[in-house]
Amino acid sequence: MTQQITVTEHLLLHQKQIPGATGQFTHLFNELVLSAKIISREVNKAGLVDVLGFTGEVNVQGEEVKKLDEYANRILIHRMARSGVLCAMASEENADIIEIPHGLPQGNYIIIFDPLDGSSNIDVNVNIGTIFSIFRRKSKLGTPVQSTDVLQAGCEQVAAGYILYGSSTMLVFTTGDGVHGFTMDPGVGEFLLSHPNMKIPDTGNIYSVNEGYWPYWSEATKKVVGHFKSRDNIHGKPYSLRYIGSLVADFHRNLIYGGVFMYPADDRDPKKPRGKLRLLCEASPMAMLIEQAGGRATDGTQRILDIIPDDLHQRVPLFIGSRHEVETISNIYKENEG
């Protein structure tokens, strides 16, 4: 049953337990929540107003930009820049680090986001989401932001989460003390605590992957996927395939039911030999969430949260979900790619 605890109340309770807390993080999160409400409003009426289809532009990833994707990006940049506690931002849609405009107050936090994950599904009314990651800067406040302030390993995150726009709008996040889910109550316009202390089952029976890319995978990756399609596993029968094609939606289902999401490296595009997903705005925040929920995340050989990025839009293979399934994947790669 939903508890009548708002996101702000939850954060303030947590803030009291931290010596020297200034309230800046809570203020930052309040702006993020407001952005989510604005984006959710537009998503819910997407078929009624002119926000479907493409803008005609191509983003830094070489992808055609959806109108709603561009809208979400613009809202997040505008709102978050005015939070007064950020020194920089980064977005999947922008080639470079986004600086806080001159004249606006700044702080020690950095936010990195994918404004609308799963945007290829927008026009067909499939669940989509916003993914975010929050760091503290390493350089001194008042000095220019350095690339090292943004290019931090996932284990340095102070918070991570996502907003899922579906049959209801949900905010799921962690600040390092477990994973908590809040559901938007449209009657009062607030996110209320609905899923406290979320935990992923230690093993599941779902695997999520686009098997259409099978011809482009390495032999080791084919053995990984083949393991879940066979009866030679912990369940003695094939896992169920469930794949939406929206990372947030697939991740959220597996978080609740257990299972594993996979986006392996492939050789479809020589420009993307490490797969499609971005380390900073997709893999790292999801990895922090899953580990806080008791799961695991790897690129096949290395823990996602240990990877130090060398590029703002660096891509990584991603295997994320229940502990048993991810450890099995790591073992298969170790045996076949040693």
UniProtKB/Swiss-Prot annotation:
Q: Which GO terms describe its cellular component?
A: cytosol
Q: What's the chief localization of this chain?
A: cytoplasm
One Pfam family, short name: FBPase
**Cofactor(s) the record lists:** Mg(2+)
The answer to whether keyword Nucleotidyltransferase applies is no
Q: What is its EC number?
A: 3.1.3.11
Q: Where in the cell is it found?
A: Cytoplasm
Disulfide-linked positions:
none
Q: Which annotated residues bind Mg(2+) 2?
A: 114, 117, 282
Tell me the pathway.
Carbohydrate biosynthesis; gluconeogenesis
Gene3D superfamilies in the record: 3.40.190.80, Fructose-1,6-Bisphosphatase, subunit A, domain 1
Q: Which reaction does it catalyse?
A: beta-D-fructose 1,6-bisphosphate + H2O = beta-D-fructose 6-phosphate + phosphate
Q: Where does substrate bind?
A: 117-120, 210, 243, 276
GO process annotations (BP): fructose 1,6-bisphosphate metabolic process; fructose 6-phosphate metabolic process; fructose metabolic process; gluconeogenesis; sucrose biosynthetic process
Q: Per the record's keyword annotation, is Hydrolase included, yes or no? A: yes
> What is an example of a GO molecular function annotated in this UniProt entry?
fructose 1,6-bisphosphate 1-phosphatase activity
Where Mg(2+) 1 binds, per the record, is at 92, 114, 116
Copy out the cofactor comment: Binds 2 magnesium ions per subunit.
Into which EC class is this enzyme placed? hydrolase
Task: Name the keywords, alphabetized.
Answer: Carbohydrate metabolism, Cytoplasm, Hydrolase, Magnesium, Metal-binding
Query: What family is it from?
Result: Belongs to the FBPase class 1 family.
Q: State the PANTHER family in the record.
A: FRUCTOSE-1,6-BISPHOSPHATASE-RELATED, SEDOHEPTULOSE-1,7-BISPHOSPHATASE, CHLOROPLASTIC
By its UniProt entry, which NCBIfam families does this protein fall under? PRK09293.1-1, PRK09293.1-3
- Kindly state the subunit structure of this protein: Homotetramer.
Annotated protein name in UniProt? Fructose-1,6-bisphosphatase class 1
Q: Organism, per UniProt?
A: Maridesulfovibrio salexigens (strain ATCC 14822 / DSM 2638 / NCIMB 8403 / VKM B-1763) (Desulfovibrio salexigens)
